[in-house]
Amino acid sequence: MDRIRIVGGNELNGIIPISGAKNAALPLMIASLLTSDTLTLENVPHLADVELLMRILGNHGVDVAVNGRRERQEDSYARTIHFTCRTIVDTTASYELVSKMRASFWVIGPLLAREGHCRVSLPGGCAIGTRPVDLFIEGLTALGATMEIDAGYINAKAPDGGLIGARYTFPKVSVGATHVMMMAATLARGTTVIGNAAREPEVVDLANCLNAMGAKISGAGTATITIEGVTSLSGARHRVLPDRIETGTYAMAVAMAGGDVVLENTDVALLETAVETLRRAGADISATNNGMRIKRNGAGIKPVDIVTDPFPGFPTDLQAQFMALMTRSSGISHVTETIFENRFMHVQELARLGARITLSGQTAKIEGVQRLRGAPVMATDLRASVSLVIAGLAAEGETTVSRVYHLDRGFERLEEKLTRCGAVVQRISE
């Protein structure tokens, strides 16, 4: 099992290219199930979750061609991948694969819309709270589907003639449930109106792609999305938007380690709340023609309180990274998590590096310290793992992060990108 070794104390200076967003790429890939034509996606990151979803889609009948060939391109960024699903050959999504990644559960929407029935295992993925599927079930039921849970699977069936458009308001904002209901509604009869919809940029990206495929979706990016059903979708070519979580992660790494870095192929507008929070913490951030520049030279890190919220609020996927930054602040800060329960598993690992953090319910109190000290630590989930890397960049001595397969799920060549900017980061294979 691989480990990441970090020698702290080095500023970051240089250019870091930002990859395509994993959280956008996954639903876009799943949308290929909605058409028998070819969906071509550009700027697809090379990540473990993307590779796993390719396998899952292949089981359903999707032919996958990477950069025009059917082999993996290990040495290239921004891959172009062609997805063609002439016929759906299997409407069952097995526990063996779905349990490894929660987002693969989202195939339930396109399979139900195109084939009228499917059997999908209940999901797995990051160990962050319960993440119930109730919202998915309720949304699809509103479109006329019958849903039955049996032996760890959901058996879903559309009414004769297909799904039927309806008005439905989610009781709680859910990005995944919004993705699924939006995809399913594209082929439903009549008009669907989704209330309390997720407003994340990844939802807008999916809607733009579906519209390019012939869907009729309006309102994406607002709390109300309207979908006029069509009889079929065609192929399209679409570029995956930049990864705002990767952007924020590297911005926080620079704020932690110090230095001057340009983040290329991204957009400040994708994470305005996080950028403003970093400015309050003492980082100097400015937009560039193709991204953003972040500097922190000499000045200390100021304590800032945050509360995670759905977009446009502070992203839960940057909470662990920001907490790592606050461990070196000049005072006391508070981090309150409102999206997921049990998303403080990184706290005890940060404490091994010398962080002073106390928990009270869903709020963490962080007392900034003058120095962190390197130590062996263990990744517990995707975002927590990178928070340990950020802390290691500023810790005295050597930090080793184990279980880095979590990192490989969501960060493309992290150690390479950091090393190019002067960090001492090394992957150790065992």
UniProtKB/Swiss-Prot annotation:
- Residues bearing the modification 2-(S-cysteinyl)pyruvic acid O-phosphothioketal: 126
Among the entry's GO cellular component annotations, what is one? Answer: cytoplasm
Identify which top EC class this enzyme belongs to. transferase
Pfam families registered for this protein in UniProt: EPSP_synthase
Q: Does the keyword Cytoplasm apply?
A: yes
What the entry lists under InterPro entries is as follows:
Enolpyruvate_Tfrase_dom, Enolpyruvate_Tfrase_sf, MurA_subfamily, RNA3'P_cycl/enolpyr_Trfase_a/b, UDP_GlcNAc_COvinyl_MurA
Primary location class: cytoplasm
GO biological processes: cell division; cell wall organization; peptidoglycan biosynthetic process; regulation of cell shape; UDP-N-acetylgalactosamine biosynthetic process
Q: Where would one find coiled-coil regions in this protein?
A: none
Q: Look up the EC number in the record and give it.
A: 2.5.1.7
Query: Which molecular-function annotation in GO is an example for this chain?
Result: UDP-N-acetylglucosamine 1-carboxyvinyltransferase activity
**Functional pathway:** Cell wall biogenesis; peptidoglycan biosynthesis
Alphabetized, the UniProt keywords read: Cell cycle, Cell division, Cell shape, Cell wall biogenesis/degradation, Cytoplasm, Peptidoglycan synthesis, Pyruvate, Transferase
Q: Where does phosphoenolpyruvate bind?
A: 22-23
Catalytic reaction equation(s) = phosphoenolpyruvate + UDP-N-acetyl-alpha-D-glucosamine = UDP-N-acetyl-3-O-(1-carboxyvinyl)-alpha-D-glucosamine + phosphate
Give the binding site residues for UDP-N-acetyl-alpha-D-glucosamine: 102, 131-135, 172-175, 317, 339
Q: Where does it localize?
A: Cytoplasm
Give the family this protein belongs to, as stated in its UniProt record.
Belongs to the EPSP synthase family. MurA subfamily.
List the PANTHER family hit by this protein, alphabetically.
UDP-N-ACETYLGLUCOSAMINE 1-CARBOXYVINYLTRANSFERASE
**Protein name according to UniProt:** UDP-N-acetylglucosamine 1-carboxyvinyltransferase
Origin organism of this chain? Rhizobium etli (strain CIAT 652)
